[in-house]
Amino acid sequence: MKSINDLIKENKFVSLPLGKKFSCAFKDWKPTKSGNGVLMQFNATEITTAKTYSGIMWLANNSVQNEEFDKTEKFIIETESELNADGYVVINMVD
């Protein structure tokens, strides 16, 4: 399996579709050089269609708050239906 550093070098950034819910596992993460967030290595499965996505995504600092993610835990996340003012997909953790 490729490391997060390999994926970054290969530019394997993935943008999840808007307005969808996913079962997601975060495999690894590292802070960005600029300190404005983290790069997350992930696998996600869209709940309604079972379509899978994998690669890396950038999460803003306010999305993560330096949380330690349990790499064995699955999370349910959802994307908002519109891009934010900066043109990024906003991802929310679902309780």
Residue spans for each PLM region:
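A generic signature of intrinsically disordered, low-complexity regions enriched in glycine/proline
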Residues: 50, 70, 74, 88-91
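A beta-strand/beta-hairpin structural motif
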Residues: 56-59
